[in-house]
Amino acid sequence: TLFRSKYTMKTDRIDSVREQAKYEVGLEKFLSTNGIGAFADTFQDLHGLKQLPGIAAQNLMGKGIGFGPEGDYKISALSAVLMKMSEGKEGATGFIEDYTYDLTPGQELELASHMLEVPPAFAATKPEIDVIPLGIGGKEDPARLIFDGVTGDGIQVTMVDMGDHFRIICADIELVKQPKPMPKLPVARIMYRHKPNFQIGTAAWCYAGGAHHSVVSTALTRDDIAMFARLTGTELITIGEDTTEADLQKFFMK
């Protein structure tokens, strides 16, 4: 009943949806009991679970619990912190993954998504629940929320292990409406434009060591991340309208 009030049910495979609800309740109780604010999973090691957590992980992120897929503890922790920092602010914050690019000349965009676990905070419309096969993991078809993403100015933030220290990378982006419907992409997604442009923005992200898992926020700004980096003594690299081709050369200078 709760799911039907929040989401549009596109499937009649209710048992699969109930399975996700069990995961959500169980995980939330375990995390709460043990004072844990973030978690990660891997689709190779889900002993005793019939499905990879889809709606379960999505709804837990909607409650402010950090998540990282494929055992990515750094993004799990970072997303929990940034969601806490964004409380009381207007906008959305949550985990996302670089997926693919629209390389239309002069209109380049990035499509960001994940195989299941995109937080509902990014939904521009009422999310739909569907049960669709997943080609990896060797589990039953998982239920997931599907939606198109919000628009507006935002930031993309990741944290990488540099061996002797951590580095935070923060890039200014503009979230946009997807150019065309995507009926054959059965996952939630957002699309955004890199700043200052696609070529420099993506090159700077890669040269800085940017990961394909990140946190996107339309609630926080580069200044918020700079404050967090100062408070934690963490190296910070920023990318935005003020980034130039000359800045890219700094990554190759000793």
Located regions from the model:
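Conserved active-site and cofactor/substrate-binding residues in soluble primary-metabolism enzymes
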Residues: 18, 22-25, 34, 72-77, ...
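Extended hydrophobic packing segments that form well-structured cores
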Residues: 139-254
